[in-house]
Design a protein with these regions (language model features):
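Conserved phosphate-interacting/catalytic interface
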Residues: 51
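Polytopic alpha-helical membrane-helix bundles and their juxtamembrane interface segments
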Residues: 1-44, 54-74, 82-195
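Extended substrate/RNA-proximal surfaces in nucleic-acid metabolism proteins
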Residues: 78
Length: 195
């Protein structure tokens, strides 16, 4: 099996786990536009992005087909994940007045990121979009531990996902047949389970 085939399979595994977790979370009713409601959006969209990534790596990239459209679709969905995570952070940790400001920022950020994805063919755009939001979410969870609104489980999940991102960004390819993308997916599965 090729490295791209293995990467596609690890993407499918990640998507399966994330969809399972999103389904479990969807079982209990949530107030519309609450932190839990937005976080369910994080999981659902992350599963969609992983599934699109599986199709991209397993079929488009391995066949040498043009990848612009599918890659843009994947990266725009990841922008939606970032939007939902920013709104999760706002709803969980900030007052309603500040939440409105976060909504405006999140909409503008999503629009700018979508334009950047369409114009700049680089995964760096995705990283620069989600990294500040992940850091904010991490910081607010750490600060919130004292008052009980932060979560050690979320902190652990974010740190594991950050390690996965570092592995991918570094291009660490020492676990053949897993390349850096495959290792990223496998480590991300563990991180998502903690979330």
């Amino acid at each position: 099996m090729t490295v791209l085939g293995v990467t596609s399979i690890t993407n499918i595994l990640l998507a399966s786990v994330v969809f399972f977790l999103a389904g479990r979370m969807s079982r209990s009713p949530k107030a519309r536009f609450s932190a839990a409601w937005y976080f369910n959006g994080v999981l659902l969209l992350l599963g969609v992005a992983a599934l699109i990534g599986a199709v991209d790596h397993g079929f488009f990239e391995s066949a040498g087909l043009p990848r612009y459209a599918i890659r843009c679709a994947d990266w725009i969905v990841l922008g939606g994940v970032t939007f939902c995570l920013l709104m999760t952070t706002a709803k969980q940790f900030f007052a309603p007045r500040v939440q409105r400001i976060f909504l405006i920022v999140a909409v503008v950020q999503f629009a700018v990121d979508t334009i950047a994805v369409l114009l700049v063919d680089s995964f760096l755009d995705v990283i620069l979009n989600y990294a500040p939001v992940m850091l904010l979410f991490l910081a607010m969870n750490i600060v919130g531990l004292r008052t009980g609104i932060g979560s050690m489980q979320m902190i652990t999940g974010i740190l594991i996902l950050s390690a996965a991102s570092a592995i991918q960004a570094a291009g660490w390819d020492r676990l053949s047949p897993l390349d850096h993308n495959g290792v990223y997916h496998v480590v991300s599965i563990l991180g998502v389970v903690f979330l």
